[in-house]
A protein has these predicted regions:
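Hydrophobic cores of alpha-helical transmembrane segments in multi-pass inner/ER membrane proteins
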Residues: 24-37, 80-98, 147-159, 199-215
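Juxtamembrane "helix-exit" motif on the non-cytosolic side of transmembrane helices
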Residues: 63-71, 126-136, 182-189
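Short, charged juxtamembrane terminal tails flanking transmembrane helices
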Residues: 216-221
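Membrane-proximal helix-loop-helix units in multi-pass membrane proteins
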Residues: 82-161
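Central hydrophobic cores of alpha-helical transmembrane segments
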Residues: 51-59, 168-182
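Non-cytosolic membrane-interface motifs at loop->transmembrane helix junctions
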Residues: 71-79, 105-107, 136-145, 190-200
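Membrane-helix boundary connector in multi-pass membrane proteins
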Residues: 159-172, 181-194
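N-terminal topogenic module of multi-pass integral membrane proteins
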Residues: 1-82
């Protein structure tokens, strides 16, 4: 009992430096806004060059000082985005720009498993916020042992299925998220905040609903 309590203890959490938090607000939200710019431009039928100009303008706007930038208000309302959301958007932007295709989750079973894991984690954290769980799940996210356990779980699809890193992009991406978190403790010092944020969770729920109606599991757009 004492060993288990020690394993998941949240004493002495590693918190990010204040300067890094401010930098992450601009970099993180700027990346998400740029991704939204490309997506909106594509949906509106803009030429690729025009869509990328829109994305670049949104990224520059995110770096304006004080209340002139959307980051100021987004940070007040939502703090910084998750490392997962930022890396997903950044990878998708790079692949769209280079013509390498869209970000793929791997074999269909694991695509569904990753999607379900994100949705269920969000619901569990919501229940924890409402004090409806017998344990404090969010507090576990401050413990240094939890990321190591989650890395092992993230590599499980790759170990069981084999194949290249490209075939298991999500496993690689999740490990990258943990690497950023362990090195910098972004965005809040809690590993759950590095993996998931409210906007990403809502997006995953929408994807799950759409996949359910379509009767298939797909790729992250």
């Amino acid at each position: 009992m004492n060993a288990a309590a020690s394993l998941f203890s949240a004493d002495n959490p590693g918190l990010p430096a204040l300067g890094l938090v401010q930098l992450w607000l601009h970099l993180g939200w700027g990346t998400l806004l740029a991704w939204l710019g490309v997506r909106m431009g594509t949906r509106l039928g803009l030429q690729p060059r025009a869509a990328w100009v829109l994305a670049s303008a949104l990224m520059v706007w995110a770096w304006l000082p004080g209340p002139y930038a959307p980051v100021h208000w987004l940070g007040l309302a939502f703090q910084g985005p998750s490392v997962m959301a930022v890396l997903l958007c950044a990878v998708d932007l790079v692949w769209r720009r280079t013509g390498s295709g869209r970000f793929r989750e791997g074999p269909s079973f694991w695509s569904g498993a990753w999607l379900a894991a994100g949705v269920l984690l969000g619901w569990a954290l919501l229940l924890d916020t409402l004090a409806l769980l017998p344990v404090s799940l969010y507090a576990w996210g401050f413990n240094a042992a939890v990321p190591a356990l989650l890395v092992l779980l993230a590599l499980l699809p790759w170990v069981l299925q084999g194949g290249s890193a490209r075939q298991h992009s999500m496993s690689v991406l999740v490990v990258a998220v943990f690497a950023v978190y362990v090195a910098l403790h972004l965005p809040t010092g809690n590993v759950w905040d590095a993996l998931l944020d409210p906007w990403l969770w809502l997006y995953l729920n929408a994807r799950a609903v759409r996949a359910g109606f379509a009767g298939r599991r797909g790729v992250l757009p």
